Amino acid sequence: MSSILKQRVRYAPYLQKLRTAEQCVELFKHGQYLGWSGFTGVGAPKVVPDAIADHVEKNNLQGKLGFNLFVGASAGPEEGRWAENDMLLRRSPHQVGKPIAKAINTGKTKFFDKHLSMFPQDLTYGFYTREKENDLLDYTIIEATAITEDGSIVPGPAVGASPEMISVSDKIIIEVNTVTPSFEGLHDIDMPVNPPFRQPYPHTTVDYRTGLTAIPVDPSKVVAIVESQTRDKVPPNTPSDETSRNIANNLLEFFEHEAKLGRLPENLHPLQSGIGNIANAVVEGLADSKFKNLTVWTEVLQDSFLDFFESGSLDFATATSIRLTEAGFDKFYENWDTYSKKLCLRSQVVSNSPEIIRRLGTIAMNTPVEVDIYAHANSTNVMGSRMLNGLGGSADFLRNSKLSVMHTPSARPSKTDKTGVSCIVPFATHVDQTEHDLDIVVTDQGLADLRGLSPKERAREIITKTSHPDYRDQLTDYLDRATFYAEKSKCLHEPHILQDAFKMHLNFQENGTMKLDSWDKKF
């Protein structure tokens, strides 16, 4: 037992349950239902999952030792290793990484995505364990950075669905990460209370705290304490580029316009932002803008938010995860006293709560796969079928925020077309967010304000303002043709030609380009 482990584990009876990761392997059997802590690649267990993968590889148990795995969102590289070893029978609700995406799209792993605000509560309802006799997860493996005097768990850089998983787990294994500094005091934990006893959330500001800083645990459920000395491994963030900066500039001009007209306050409303180079560009733009005293209510914070804090423009941020690179975490730890006063990590049912999002009037900003001319957005399935990562929390925010923004390049790079694949299409091949959820669509070409517009008005606005010039005439032609035929059949509300609606996608699959010679082309 290391001295730092003894210092971190302040509940003495747990020290009698010390095990190595290898000693825990015997506890796991094929077909079990497992919960892991973690969210967006940080705060997940590491040494126990790796020990199980070692066991599978050494004994050629690929496909013979598999599990139903539930994580708040994505975990770290450990779940990718599980996917490579055919150890994931079922996975939910969100994932990131080529190995697991391959397992899902080749049919080896059954995957279902779910709104991240709903997933933890549905887990406590027994919806995902209803095939089991006791409705419980067999094991939850949770990473802690400290354990309090009463046995409660202090998470690390992610809370996610850990409170709910612990509440519905038969047995619990705690990995105490001693290479990561203790995050004690940074969290605000809400334990699940199911209907009809659930009460309204009291949060009225982004810095409101209920007061619980660790996750309560029934000590009798804890079967092992394992020391971990493995840091989170987050790949470098995609830097902003000219396209993403143009998107950010278009959006910031809109914010300035709305503030000038009094539809937004001078410090805006609490901001929600996703991950990626567009999100980075927006954060960078806000840090350099005239907007001050800003606040954030979001799912995940990345490295750019540290610079946002340092700019003096950001007062406080709430999230369920801090997804930082190694350099980002080093910077965070070095300035702990500064950042910890301006930051709160919450359960994902709180960070993504539609009730709180609507009350605070957040501004939601997310990136889709594609948006169609009537403002339906596809966030998950390329060409309607190939799963990327999952829905995540985008719809939690987009349906409930005061302003719901979809930002996307007008076209994405393609190996077979110099313009790329159009992100504005006649008809989305899969719909995650409907036309009723989006207020703004913004690309590097411009911004379409859709508030209060009819479908045909939205279509003209989206095509004219946001589509790539190389696709604009083609999309306009589709809308004109659809309107012509719809007028004949008296169905002009939202005109479509079903036999043409996916021709851009079909042409890309057959010919490597979304550019059509003619809409009369047959497939």
From Swiss-Prot:
Give the E.C. number(s). 3.1.2.1
Which GO molecular function terms does the record list?
Answer: acetate CoA-transferase activity; acetyl-CoA hydrolase activity
**Location of the active site:** 299
Protein task: Presumably involved in regulating the intracellular acetyl-CoA pool for fatty acid and cholesterol synthesis and fatty acid oxidation.
Localization per Swiss-Prot or TrEMBL: Cytoplasm
Reaction(s) this enzyme catalyzes, per UniProt: acetyl-CoA + H2O = acetate + CoA + H(+)
Q: Which UniProt keywords apply?
A: Cytoplasm, Hydrolase
InterPro entries associated with the record: AcetylCoA_hyd_C, AcetylCoA_hyd_C_sf, ActCoA_hydro, ActCoA_hydro_N, NagB/RpiA_transferase-like
The gene from which this protein is expressed is ACH1
Class of this enzyme: hydrolase
List the residue ranges forming a coiled coil, or say none.
none
Chain ranges passing through the membrane: none
Binding, CoA: 274-278, 389, 393
Name the record gives this protein: Acetyl-CoA hydrolase
- GO CC terms on record? cytosol; mitochondrion
Q: Name one GO biological process term.
A: acetate metabolic process
Q: What is the lineage of its organism?
A: Eukaryota, Fungi, Dikarya, Ascomycota, Saccharomycotina
State the family named in the UniProt similarity comment for this chain: Belongs to the acetyl-CoA hydrolase/transferase family.
